[in-house]
Amino acid sequence: LPISEFYTADCQKNTLNIERKIRNLMREVTLNKGGTFTIKSVEVMPESLPAVFTRLVADNVGQYEKSLVIDLGGTTLDVGVIVGQFEDVSAVHGNPDIGVSMVTKATLTALKMASSDTSPMIADELIKNRNNLDFVGQVVNEVSKLNLVLDTIDTAINKLGELVVDDLLQYRNVNRV
């Protein structure tokens, strides 16, 4: 589950959400070729926090050090503060209004303005390859709008960065990010 759904606002496990997730997964599954199997056991974990566990151990993080874990997804920003090597989770936060899709949407709008109506997949590839002018030229139909498209991408990325930083200001007192 996303951090903000796995934990309550006071950093306790949200047993209601966890049980709901388990019930949703404990079922018979039918494969494409007709075979079936039943899921008999499920362990629900908070997204992104376990991913840093090996790093915390490798870095020999002390028991009182606080680590800020940031998970910037397509449509959400999830944050957790881990104490030590996962001895405790001292803060959780989720913001459903901040995500990478903000850049994708801005790019799609700019592409439409450049007579290049396309898909989110192509927009995402353009964002990743925006410094490859050969690729940009293949995607942007109206060459006179090429700078508009690239400027829109840069502006959207900068805006996303500002929103993330602003949203994380309350976590200034951590030891590591």
Regions found by a protein language model. Give the residues of each.
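Conserved, helical-rich catalytic subdomain that frames metal- and/or nucleotide-binding sites
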Residues: 115-136
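Nucleotide/phosphate-binding catalytic cleft detector across ATP-hydrolyzing
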Residues: 1-69, 87-100, 133-177
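Hydrophobic, aromatic-enriched interface-forming segments
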Residues: 49, 70-81
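Glycine-rich phosphate-binding loop plus the immediately following alpha-helix
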Residues: 80-122
